């Protein structure tokens, strides 16, 4: 992130506190090259405050000014200037505000900050060739935040804004939302996200809605096999018969039952119980399939009855939400090539790289 310090910050640093403020601001920006410092006005070199800085800081500023004379750019992510505290929307700050803003970790807001972190770590590790994102995450400069589901993202960000006196300019974050579609033509999530996406636009917050149902749907086939093992081999065998697109929208943990209503589930349970009472050895048929939305039934029409039965109730691994995502961190079964194979058919076949580059551009 490019941070420009205006000449006014140097000229106004006349007392001891302001001088310390300037020195601390420079330290935050320059420490371990976290941010890219920009100072265009060579006149700062003649200010009293510049002369009181550490020699290493003075040398750095002189080099920056010399380089900017050769290759000047007016594109900045953050501007620090006297009177910047009057701004509430644009990324313009006073020196005191800039310290608060730049000390914040960059927040990647997830629907489940703990479990989804494994997916994001894989994206950073495998789709950022610079290594910056993984480095920033290790340093604590990128933080995963738990929004508590998509319905709470707006409240989460509103609370963050209030922490900074109601100024939205203090938001430093990127929101990643599950696609939540049950099948490709499912419009319910689009309606659900419409208001949130509009508000994120107003707040100038970057976001991405996954093309697949959720992060679990990006798991490569090799990783699925490893997780299922021999215990859930029948489920895995059935899963492998699905097309790439069908895998995108399956609820892996809950199966198809999550796509019918509570009352429909009760009816299904009653029918299943009656069948088992009549003949425990009779081959069971799916009662769930007929209750799915017609578009979803059509989408999975190619799935045989036997395979549908295996997939119907999901992959019932104990502590699924904890254990399953951990496989994104297993480099033996989860790597760049097989993650790319899971997105090659999408509208954006490089979706994971798109996510990584969007965050990289902001930090």
Each language-model region and where it sits:
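N-terminal extension/subdomain marker
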Residues: 1-88
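Conserved small-residue
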Residues: 1-10, 346-358, 362
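Short, charged N-terminal helix-start/capping segments
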Residues: 26-43, 86-106, 352, 361-363
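Intrinsically disordered, low-complexity basic segments at termini and long loops, enriched
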Residues: 40, 54, 343, 351-352
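C-terminal structured domain segments
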Residues: 41-43, 47, 270-346
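RecA-like P-loop NTPase motor core
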Residues: 65-181
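Glycine- and acidic-residue-rich phosphate-binding/metal-coordinating active-site segment common to enzymes
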Residues: 132-242
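Activity-critical C-terminal alpha-helical subdomain
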Residues: 191-310
């Amino acid at each position: 992130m490019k941070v420009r310090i205006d000449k006014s910050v140097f000229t106004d640093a006349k007392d001891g506190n302001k001088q310390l403020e300037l020195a601390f601001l420079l330290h935050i920006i320059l420490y371990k090259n976290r941010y890219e410092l920009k100072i265009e006005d060579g006149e700062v070199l003649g200010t009293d405050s510049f002369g009181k800085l550490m020699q290493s800081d003075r040398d750095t500023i002189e080099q920056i000014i010399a380089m900017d004379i050769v290759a000047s750019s007016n594109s900045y992510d953050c501007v620090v200037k006297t009177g910047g505290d009057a701004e509430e929307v644009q990324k313009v700050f006073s020196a005191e505000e800039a310290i608060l803003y730049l000390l914040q970790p960059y927040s990647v807001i997830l629907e489940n900050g703990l479990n989804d972190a494994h997916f994001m770590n894989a994206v950073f590790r495998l789709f950022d060739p610079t290594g910056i994102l993984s480095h920033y995450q290790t340093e604590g400069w990128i933080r995963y935040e738990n929004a508590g589901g998509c319905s709470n993202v707006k409240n989460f960000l509103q609370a963050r804004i209030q922490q900074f006196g109601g100024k939205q300019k203090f938001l430093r974050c990127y929101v990643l939302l599950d696609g939540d579609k049950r099948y490709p033509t499912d419009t319910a999530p689009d309606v659900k996200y419409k208001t949130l996406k509009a508000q994120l636009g107003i707040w100038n917050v970057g976001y991405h809605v996954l093309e697949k149902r959720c992060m679990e749907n990006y798991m490569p086939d090799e990783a699925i096999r490893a997780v299922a093992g021999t215990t859930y081999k029948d489920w895995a065998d059935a899963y492998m018969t699905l097309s790439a697109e069908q895998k995108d929208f399956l609820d892996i943990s809950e199966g198809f039952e999550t796509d019918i209503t509570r009352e429909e589930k009760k009816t299904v349970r009653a029918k299943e119980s009656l069948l088992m009472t009549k003949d425990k050895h009779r081959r069971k048929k799916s009662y769930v399939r007929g209750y799915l939305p017609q578009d979803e039934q059509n989408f999975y029409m190619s799935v045989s009855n036997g395979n549908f039965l295996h997939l119907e109730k999901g992959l019932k691994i104990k502590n699924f939400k904890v254990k399953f995502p951990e496989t994104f961190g297993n480099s033996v079964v989860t790597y760049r090539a097989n993650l790319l194979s899971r997105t090659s058919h999408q509208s954006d076949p490089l979706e994971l790289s798109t996510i990584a580059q969007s965050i990289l551009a902001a930090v």
